[in-house]
């Protein structure tokens, strides 16, 4: 008798087996220079977010739970080595802490904050090169992105957090390559990860902080699933298309077209968008259009009578994006397109400080005067492009408008600048330069785990401050 977890369901090849075989067999040297460069930029961007978010409550809470162990994995910006699952959890929460993490629009998921913490935590336990770590991450992004494209709809994303749904598969496949599992073991890890899909979007309606912990749950679960598979645990191969598998359970429909990784040699990581500001992905292009409008309005926002925002249906439908207040927490403001646009118009800038002005009377006046609509053309172009148009009617009856066909991503120089500032504030300028140099040449590194050690506080023995007893 053969258990399904160790073979195919009913004697037929499953979608999971085909996907896992492709993920595990992708050659380390099979990715183009452009793909590798994008992966390194995403890695640096992730680290910049993790360093900058260290003082925030959710980052501190996650770090406080990390259990010190000998020869463990390191937390970004801390000194103590911890259990790999604890490190993955804390580093994922910190990477998500600013709401500036990278974004894959087609899956509506933040893949970097589940993939990189898993890869870096495991790279300290299992000896892999930088090239192997980069390839593992690229495969992880690809896995999450392709599954996400197949399953995520605006209706599903209204209830479930896409990062929590597809992230476990992404992190498990990235980690399987670092750990060195064989295909059957990786398939079992993949199936186990399917049982860790979770994350509800109620936080977007309340502003509560559970959102920040979603990637942490994913990364920690992925490490656990990999350990279980390595020890012989089995899982359902039909986890994707089965009667009670991922697609029927969450999408309420069967799996359609088979999911293929790297079709025609294209890598999904190249479709990842690096945010210029710490706010919801869907608020980025409307705020950028609003900034162009603000620069054309003489005398400031007090001359504005009304605001009209046109963008994609996905943006309008995503939980929290159409919120008009009241805003009790900055997270609610970061999710709200009307708030983001109003704050940009009122302050003439897109900045983190905008989202601290929850009681600003002028921002509130503009939010109340705002109409948010889905535009058919922008909707048709999504997710390849994320367009937006902002039209303001002035009190004198004239109008000012600006439109973007697509969001403007943070560029290489911006990502490097904010990494340097954040890392240097924690570790000093010399250490920050060493980290950046290692990331730049990561494909030549003989020990990928050295990067995680570089990101830790050198020589520190004190564990993260604990606020919750064990």
Task: Name each region found by the language model.
Residues 143-169, 215:
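Aromatic-lined, polymer-binding surfaces characteristic
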Residues 53, 119-126, 172-178, 225-229, ...:
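Well-ordered alpha-helical scaffold segments within catalytic/enzyme domains
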Residues 94-149:
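Hydrophobic alpha-helical hairpins/lids featuring a short glycine-rich hinge
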Residues 112-120, 167-174, 219-224, 283-285, ...:
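Well-ordered alpha-helical segments within folded domains of soluble proteins
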Residues 11, 15-19, 61, 131-140, ...:
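Extended, well-ordered alpha-helical scaffold segments
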Residues 192-200:
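Flexible glycine/proline-rich, aromatic-decorated loop/lid segments
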Residues 1-108, 205, 210-220, 227-470:
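Terminal-appendage/accessory-domain detector
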Residues 125-137, 180-187, 235-238, 298:
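Structural helix-adjacent loops and short alpha-helical linkers that scaffold large soluble proteins
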